[in-house]
Amino acid sequence: MSKEAIEMIRKMDMEQVENQFVLQCAPLIAGLKMSNLFIIRKNHLRRLCALLQNSGIRCRVLYLDGDKLTVLLYNPAMLAIYMRNKRVTTILMENGYEQFDLESILLEFGRRYRSYRTENKSFPHELGLLLGYPIDDVEGFITVSYTHLTLPTT
């Protein structure tokens, strides 16, 4: 990246949701990724929704923490196709999901994510599937619990 481009980015007002969106979600906007996790101030949600109108990208609020929202931005067509992958469905089934249409998956994931944030429940590693991470990586994170890892002693 050129020095000019870097300087231009540094001068951008990162409090503006439009700038955050373009910089953090460029692969999603370009159709190269199916989803993106995005954290914004609560008072920016309306501007984000207006920005997404007619874009083909949807927004789902996962969690409110003070004045910050954690949202999942996603291309519904791309994500629905991916979530129908047999290995993805198997992982979800093994982790207690009962319905496998995109809306049901997103509702259940949202519930689990909120439980993780508010009730100290285990982290819902299926987030990796929703973000398009390699299936083998997601399976590995689900299978290997951090409680089984030990640090070397010196």
Name these PLM-found stretches:
Residues M1-I40:
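Short, extreme N-terminal leader segments that mark the start of a protein/domain
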Residues K33-S35, D67-L69, P124-E126:
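Short, surface-exposed beta-edge/turn micro-motifs
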Residues I39-K42, L73-N75:
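Short beta-strand-to-loop capping motifs
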Residues R47-D101:
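A glycine-rich, hydrophobic loop/mini-helix early in the fold
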Residues D101-N120:
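Helix-hairpin-helix/helix-loop-helix acidic hairpins
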Residues F123-Y146:
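Hydrophobic/aromatic-rich, well-ordered segments within soluble, folded domains that form packed cores
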Residues T147-T153:
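Conserved small/polar residues in nucleotide/adenosyl-binding loops
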